[in-house]
Amino acid sequence: MPNRIWLCGDTHMHSSISDGKYTPDELIEKCQAKGLDWIIITDHNKNAVGEKSYYSENLLVIPGAEYTGRNGHMNIYGSGLPEFDGTRPEKYEQYLSMSALAHSNGCTVSINHPFCSRFGWRMPFEDFPTDCVEIWNMFMHQSNMTCISWWERQILGGRRIAALGGSDYHRDYGTSDMLASPTTFVFAESNSEKDILSALRRGNSFITNSPDASRLVLSYKDCVQGDEIKFVPGMKVNLRAERLRKNMTLRVFNNEKIIYEHRIGSESELDEDISITEKGFVRAQITYRLRGFRKAFFNIKMALWRPKEKNIPYDTAVWCITNPMWVV
């Protein structure tokens, strides 16, 4: 397999071309300051980037758009972006047609924040022709955890649908800067549109709270999460965890079974070989408990951004999560 590198980016953000505060150039400057390698600007039913990807210094800027209607939001990524006439879709058939057109143009499709109380997906989506699903939108909150649970059921049932995260950034709120929160890291052959989108579709990725937050990599020989490996009795998969935070919990799953669990202490890194007992998949995640100041700050954010969800019981949140490594 060709050499691959880890590259970080944000799949979901808005500029002043639709309802964001900053111009595309200003948004790009903010992303460069975050240390991102690639971004996809996804204005509502508009293309703010142009026909092709380009580089602003070392930052890859990929064309995108959020196909937006009252029944659901869907991101489309890539240089073959369809033209939009400004009409907001109303019917399921319009989403199906747009997904088909996007795919025929070589684009990548992702369903956005499907369980969001304000802008959720209100149509059938178990069999919708999408490459990815945005399981983590904005800061981690209740509807994201619901989506993660849904996604877990999908992959347990054998559906290979890649998970990704997007900040859905529009502007700063006081001192709260949510750009690149979360951040999606992809394992790609190069920092090009073709290789970034291919890695997103395959699930060669993990999602984490920010560019500087924890990192999780599952590997077997030259394969990582998103790749397919052959089951061998007695086999072990390597887990490499970096930038760990105290009092969080790291778990590795072989299908629904927890095969490794560790309460993080003072260590900042961890390297473990973990035995795999059955075919299916392996994935890893880090979770934390909402307590004290963190809980109070979370409640304030929910009251502002997701008031319909603020009273839903919630005390465990995902901090970092991988896509599955498929074991066949």
Provide a role label for each language-model segment.
Residues 158-160, 205-206:
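Extended two-metal-dependent nuclease catalytic cores across DNA- and RNA-processing enzymes
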